[in-house]
């Protein structure tokens, strides 16, 4: 049918939402590798060629350039990407990236590492310009990199009617954190 022809001609993208990951760190590379394993479109973006070395070594799609540069709009097709994760070491930069792409990708699908905003903290960035917290626990860049160095890994679990999300959570170690789930009916949901 027309759907099959469109796929064969590369006119139609994947059914899975793609991830654009800003910032090339060991943790973001692990996330990108898991997304690639799940056959979701993924792109790692960083302005540093050196930081992109791990992405290149792992055969991950990458973009070498400044995501906020106007030229990037012309050089990087964002069509396959429904989720943006800003995970550089600079929280203010991550917020700026999320704010910039919230209108194009959607405010509900731009995420950054770090805590949800405490509106009473005069040192924190306002929630109106930040991305959503990627983890419910508020893990920041240092937190995820430290956990990764201690053996933290991404795992995937196939859910079913007999083995649902709650049952899967019960089997995880106490220190485990759920990041996302893919539901065939409801799509991608960040946990």
Positions of PLM-derived features:
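Cytosolic regulatory regions of ion transport systems
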Residues: 1-191
